[in-house]
Amino acid sequence: MKGLIVYSSLSGNTKKIAEAIAEVAEDSELISVREFQSSMLANFDLFYIGYWVDKGDCDAATLRLLAQLKDKRIVLFGTLGAAEQTEYYDRVKQQVESHAVHSHILGHFLCQGAVGEAVIARYQSMLAVHPQDEHIKQQLANYENGKSHPDEQDLANARAFAKSIG
């Protein structure tokens, strides 16, 4: 089965996961979403689609890509700034999968990634205005803890996930 790994990455986190998957996904090619062309659809049997989370959903470039994947076998993977919170992760997965209802989803991997400094600065500004806001404090703590992600364990988990797909 010939696979195509297509990723969208704002800060490099999803690219790292895509590269880890590419190490173990046999007979697969790795490209950025910017390199993807619809003419490629006929050349592959399996599509690994990597995204970064933007406000609880996949990024816009991935949305456009998913709209083109009708009746395809796909594997989803993504990164987000939040620490592993099962309920939130599940909501994100459901939301992203809702854009691929016309495809056969074989699996979905999600892990924490480091957040850009601009996002952290925005939350710090919000905290200055609302110093008692526990949600903002928790977000900043998550972002601080996430600076090392995706880490070696995340990459190992991504490889194991890809191997489980076959």
Where are the regions that the model predicts?
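FMN-binding flavodoxin-like domain, especially the glycine-rich phosphate-binding loop
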Residues: 24-28, 46-49, 54-166
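Short, Lys/Arg-enriched, disordered terminal segments
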Residues: 1-2, 166
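The conserved SAM/SAH-binding core of class I Rossmann-like methyltransferase domains
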Residues: 6, 31, 77
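Alpha-helix C-terminal capping/helix-to-coil transition sites in glycosyltransferase folds
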Residues: 42-44
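Short, surface-exposed acidic/glycine-rich loop or hinge patches that mediate macromolecular interfaces
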Residues: 8-11, 35, 52-56
